[in-house]
UniProtKB/Swiss-Prot annotation:
Record's protein name: Phytoene synthase 2, chloroplastic
Oligomer status and interactors: Monomer.
Superkingdom assignment: Eukaryota
Annotated function: Catalyzes the reaction from prephytoene diphosphate to phytoene.
GO annotation terms (biological process): carotenoid biosynthetic process
Gene giving rise to this polypeptide: PSY2
Organelle targeting peptide span: 1-25
Source organism of the structure: Solanum lycopersicum (Tomato)
CDD domains: Trans_IPPS_HH (cd00683)
Length: 310
């Protein structure tokens, strides 16, 4: 019976989860802080998902990225199927394998993320926001969809499951747009421009301006619009947070508010995201936690919004 877990396996599994936590603490400090507010079983599950996403991203962005082939991504996707079928390849896979056996996680967003990495292999420009949105869905909207089954929807929520997933999707998109706006200079040095080409052109800008890395009035006007759009996605996401199970509202709101603050920091840097990397200081991060906690106490709406589909 595969459900009989031997004590030795239990020890290895708990070690596997701890290792996932360490990876998370090392590479995603803000995100890690958010996970510390979760219930232990949820925290471990989110760590396992984070580590898989991180390793997937490393295939395209990591030290060996220049050697990666579409075939390697196919192998990675086959390995994903094995994880979901209870056949993990290594320790970190084992943590995710355990997570997907405990929570009703769907494989599709994971497959979609691999698809995003395939896109990243050949695409380094985005003609318009529709193209960029699709990329953001693949690499980050998927993370929102992966997380909902872990976070759980409040039993008393009257919202449709679809609306909660849409809010989670919006949060993933908002986070990725924020990453893109924070990392413009860094990406340009890798020959990549994750900004809509048509909107750059409308602002009288081109790739050359980005590679030159000079903050001009044109750039400030362009950036204001991009930041405004990212904030809209955060606002959209915030509407769904109240529908999550009570224990999950605080960590998700904290992550949302912390990430949204990066946009404030880009503004504080006078839109210089070429040579400065906007980040939120530790005191600001800690101040955000009680604010998020207070907001997290708001229960799900007792009746669904009058405009919502019933």
């Amino acid at each position: 019976d595969p459900d009989i877990v031997l004590p030795g396996n239990l020890g290895l599994l708990s070690e596997a989860y701890d290792r996932c936590g360490e990876v998370c603490a090392e590479y995603a400090k803000t995100f890690y802080l958010g996970t510390m507010l979760m219930t232990p079983d949820r925290r471990r599950a989110i760590w396992a998902i984070y580590v898989w996403c991180r390793r997937t991203d490393e295939l395209v962005d990591g030290p060996n990225a220049s050697h990666i082939t579409p075939q390697a991504l196919d192998r990675w996707e086959a390995r994903l199927e094995d994880i979901f079928n209870g056949r993990p390849f290594d320790m970190l896979d084992a943590a995710l394998s355990d997570t997907v056996s405990r929570f009703p996680v769907d494989i599709q967003p994971f497959r979609d993320m691999v698809e995003g990495m395939r896109m990243d292999l050949w695409k380094s420009r985005y003609n318009n926001f529709d193209e960029l949105y699709l990329y953001c869905y693949y690499v980050a909207g998927t993370v929102g969809l992966m997380s909902v089954p872990i976070m759980g929807i409040a039993p008393e929520s009257k919202a449709t499951t679809e609306s909660v997933y849409n809010a989670a999707l919006a949060l993933g998109i908002a986070n990725q747009l924020t990453n893109i706006l924070r990392d413009v200079g860094e990406d340009a040095r890798r020959g990549r421009v994750y900004l809509p080409q048509d909107e750059l052109a409308q602002a009288g800008l081109s790739d050359e301006d980005i590679f030159a890395g000079k903050v001009t009035d044109k750039w400030r006007i362009f950036m204001k619009k991009q930041i405004q759009r990212a904030r809209k996605f955060f606002d959209e996401a915030e509407k769904g947070v109240t529908e999550l199970s009570s224990a999950s509202r605080w960590p998700v709101l904290a992550s949302l508010l912390l990430y949204r603050k990066i946009l404030d920091e880009i503004e504080a840097n006078d839109y210089n995201n070429f040579t400065r990397r906007a980040y939120v200081s530790k005191p600001k991060k800690l101040l955000t936690l009680p604010i998020a906690y207070a907001r997290s106490l708001v229960p799900p709406k007792s009746t669904s919004c009058p405009l919502a589909k019933t």
